[in-house]
Amino acid sequence: MLDKLDAALRFQQEALNLRAQRQEVLAANIANADTPGYQARDIDFASELKKVMQRGRDATSVVALTMTSTQHIPAQALTPPTAELQYRIPDQPSLDGNTVDMDRERTQFADNSLQYQMSLSALSGQIKGMMNVLQSGN
């Protein structure tokens, strides 16, 4: 039963993890907007989510946990996703080699924040739906 519950929530969980990781990358781009030579980076969300979901199906990302007591419940933990960072090609490169376009970064940052909130709402809706089913006894 827990396997089915985990599978039902896994997609949203992985999407949230990748969105949070992308938010950090975009924040780093914004923070380094005035750093000479800084290369703007980003994550291809769709392809990275596919990779993470496939890796989970292959069960190659499972890490064994050590039980310190025989009364503990055996479990497995997934390794956190580490997305491949890609460099952005600038529309107008600056003279100092910095490729951060603040308008693009702000737009991407706001869009990613909105997508994160939508994923969180979808996950919350899934959990509420499951709770309703459990409480109704069906």
Swiss-Prot record:
Identify the PROSITE patterns for this entry: FLAGELLA_BB_ROD (PS00588)
- A Gene Ontology CC term for this entry? bacterial-type flagellum
Q: What happens when the gene is disrupted?
A: Strongly repressed swarming and swimming.
Query: Carries keyword Methyltransferase?
Result: no
Q: How does it assemble?
A: The basal body constitutes a major portion of the flagellar organelle and consists of a number of rings mounted on a central rod. In Gram-negative bacteria, at least four rings, L, P, S and M are present, whereas Gram-positive bacteria lack the L and P rings. The rod consists of about 26 subunits of FlgG in the distal portion, and FlgB, FlgC and FlgF build up the proximal portion of the rod with about 6 subunits each.
Q: Which PANTHER family match?
A: FLAGELLAR BASAL BODY ROD PROTEIN FLGB, FLAGELLAR PROTEIN
Question: What family is this protein classified in?
Answer: Belongs to the flagella basal body rod proteins family.
**Protein name in UniProt:** Flagellar basal body rod protein FlgB
Organism, by scientific name, is Escherichia coli (strain K12)
Q: Per UniProt, what is the name of the gene that codes for the protein in this document?
A: flgB
